[in-house]
Amino acid sequence: MCGICCSVNFSAEHFSQDLREDLLYNLKQRGPNSSKQLFKSDVNYQCLFSGHVLHLRGVLTTQPVEDERGNVFLWNGEIFSGIKVEAEENDTQILFNYLSSCKNESEILSLFSEVQGPWSFIYYQASSHYLWFGRDFFGRRSLLWHFSNLGKSFCLSSVGTQTSGLANQWQEVPASGLFRIDLKSTAISRCIILQLYPWKYISRENIIEENVNSLSQISADLPAFVSVVANEAKLYLEKPVVPLNMMLPQAALETHCSNISNVPPTRETLQVFLTDVHIKEVIQQFIDVLSVAVKKRVLCLPRGENLTANEVSKMCDRKANVAILFSGGIDSMVIATLADRHIPLDEPIDLLNVAFIAEEKTMPTSFNKERNKQKNKCEISSEEFSKDDAAADDDSPDKHVSVPDRITGRAGLKELKAVSPSRIWNFVEINVSMEELQKLRRTRICHLIQPLDTVLDDSIGCAVWFASRGIGWLVAQDGVKSYQSSAKVVLTGIGADEQLAGYSRHRVRFQSHGLEGLNKEIMMELGRISSRNLGRDDRVIGDHGKEARFPFLDENVVSFLNSLPIWEKANLTLPRGIGEKLLLRLAAVELGLTASALLPKRAMQFGSRIAKMEKNNEKASDKCGRLQIISLENLSIEKETKL
């Protein structure tokens, strides 16, 4: 992962050959292993390229990279499939070599259509004065744009800065395809024209209508001197996943559990589905494709190849290379179980579990209430929860921490130990006080969440920032010790709910509009995931010099799930804890998981209790006053107090 930036100016007298201090600092946070800036000047324009690399594969390749013809490339991505990259090779250099050999725009589009994995990039094509940029189909890597001074300058960057309330603030580059700017003609006209090369399905006949709608939506958010137009050659990128299967059953579906609609969910209920040969086959196919996705994401990183045999034998001294955002819920449990298959057994796995602690919270009453509430919801026996959790609570660095995700996290840890007892599972208890939340939101997190600005963005953005930072406590047999995760790769379960009808709104839509309405809701979820979640989470996790990886959004996983009819993925006639994400729950049972396979969806902001920390009367969609733009006078203070 990297922090990449390109600042372009069409007015020489006002151009600085350096970035603002705060922007440079934010970029370096993302790429701590190397930094470099490159200045390119033409009669009509000046470009400053800035690259900051987090080294995760092959030979450390400093960015930006430049070839003998003056082409410049900045890459923030991972090639997991599509283009062959050997273990010792760096994908930045491999992709740049291919890109430099492209003879026309069609070849550039064909190249990026082949890449599977998360990416954003900036490419300066010197001979034609073109600047290309874009994000992958799902928008798994952040890229922002900022247009200022009535067309005199613009900037592209992985992360922005706080702009003190000025108009035309940073905005996310839409994950709509590739964009191209002709810098030479822009310098003359002072009107920035963005040519769009959109994603499309090759067989779709309505691509022109879709493209027109996309252009108008993008243009609506841009200044008057910036316009978005379809590329003149009508060329397109090929979408990397198959279309969503919108098929509806010709007759009423017969459920295997028609008599359980009002029965509390149990593991035995799920076992009934596993007697069906076809369902069992689909589950195994799902496990296989998801397992490969996890494997790519946990093995594609540098490990301690130079360790001595004596060092390797000291398992307790080994550092984790992979961490998982871990609530103990079904998504993180399945990811952890599959990661265990592929990560070397002598390597620990960090399970990052975050809880927000209100000062007034007291201990046993709230703990018992939460435990009983969870038990009632999921029909998990008190014996299954209480023995391990009570012991953990006795030794916890903060005995008052009994938020729902901590309780399910500890129970999930117990399950993982049963599935893989030889693995060292580092359950990292990350406890955040009101004071720490408010201080670091103000000085550090606020600008990472922006340009998103809702109460929901604030809650999830802050929770993910503290969780991925990985500073907390380990509760072990020999006592409690402070701990900071050194893992550079952070796995997250984003994408499971969107594809498998995991949200409560899916059940509401199904109840009002049936399977057809549910299909449309899922299509909408996947279509907007880049603008709702992924750019924000990439900025937040990347701020720690770590890389977010999303197994559920692997192109092959999405294509497999898209190919299935909706009733093989979810059955919302069944109760919570079974019907939503049914396919994933059945996969969890096949993988040997127990109580976690029945946990109903609980949003991170509620499970971690961040939603209860401040105002309780806010709606998730409200604009969040706590994210209001402030000046970065705190930057030097933040540097001094950074933990």
Swiss-Prot record:
Active site: 2
Taxonomic lineage from the root: Eukaryota, Metazoa, Chordata, Craniata, Vertebrata
Residue span of region Disordered: 367-404
Compositional bias per record (Basic and acidic residues), positions renumbered to this chain: 367-390
GO MF annotations in UniProt: asparagine synthase (glutamine-hydrolyzing) activity
Ranges where the Glutamine amidotransferase type-2 domain occurs: 2-184
Listed name of the protein: Asparagine synthetase domain-containing protein 1
Gene3D superfamilies: Glutamine Phosphoribosylpyrophosphate, subunit 1, domain 1 (3.60.20.10), HUPs (3.40.50.620)
Keywords: Amino-acid biosynthesis, Asparagine biosynthesis, Glutamine amidotransferase
One GO-annotated biological process of the protein: asparagine biosynthetic process
Species of origin: Macaca fascicularis (Crab-eating macaque)
Pfam families the record matches: Asn_synthase
Residue ranges the record marks as coiled coil: none
Spans traversing the lipid bilayer: none
Record carries keyword Cytoplasm: no
